[in-house]
Amino acid sequence: MGMRMMFTVFLLVVLATTVVSFPSDRASDGRDDEAKDERSDMHESDRNGRGCCCNPACGPNYGCGTSCSRTL
């Protein structure tokens, strides 16, 4: 194998590993859409724009429809 061919193979390997190891935002956004969505059932707002906690862990303290200082 000539020097030019070895350099070309080296560049192809570097390019392939860079593309494979580069994190894709498109793939992760699909999985996290509901977690980031503020209109999901775990994160609601009342008419004044204040948040309320609909998480079952804090639901007894801050029910949906009442304002709480901490939201998900």
From Swiss-Prot:
Domain of life: Eukaryota
Main location: secreted
Post-translational modification: The disulfide bond Cys-52-Cys-68 (Cys I-VI), which corresponds to an extra disulfide bond when compared to the cysteine framework I (CC-C-C), does contribute to conotoxin SII stability and imparts a unique binding mode at the nAChR.
Gene Ontology molecular function: any one: toxin activity
Entries under Pfam families matching the protein: Toxin_8
UniProt note on tissues of expression: Expressed by the venom duct.
Cited InterPro entries: Conotoxin_a-typ, Conotoxin_a-typ_CS
Bias (Basic and acidic residues): 26-49
Annotated Gene Ontology cellular component terms: extracellular region; host cell postsynaptic membrane
Location(s) in or outside the cell: Secreted
Signal peptide range: 1-21
UniProt keywords, alphabetically: Acetylcholine receptor inhibiting toxin, Disulfide bond, Ion channel impairing toxin, Neurotoxin, Postsynaptic neurotoxin, Secreted, Signal, Toxin
Region (Disordered): 23-51
Propeptide residue range(s): 22-50, 70-72
S-S bonds: C52-C68, C53-C58, C54-C64
Family membership: Belongs to the conotoxin A superfamily.
Function: Alpha-conotoxins act on postsynaptic membranes, they bind to the nicotinic acetylcholine receptors (nAChR) and thus inhibit them. This toxin potently inhibits the rodent muscle nAChR (IC(50)=120 nM (adult subtype, alpha-1-beta-1-delta-epsilon/CHRNA1-CHRNB1-CHRND-CHRNE) and IC(50)=370 nM (fetal subtype, alpha-1-beta-1-gamma-delta/CHRNA1-CHRNB1-CHRNG-CHRND)) and weakly inhibits neuronal nAChRs.
UniProt free text on domains: The cysteine framework is II (CCC-C-C-C).
Extra information: Negative results: shows no or weak inhibition on neuronal nAChR alpha-3-beta-2/CHRNA3-CHRNB2, alpha-3-beta-4/CHRNA3-CHRNB4, alpha-4-beta-2/CHRNA4-CHRNB2, alpha-4-beta-4/CHRNA4-CHRNB4, alpha-7/CHRNA7, alpha-9-alpha-10/CHRNA9-CHRNA10. Has no effect on the release of catecholamines evoked by nicotine.
Protein name (record): Alpha-conotoxin SII
Species, as recorded: Conus striatus (Striated cone)
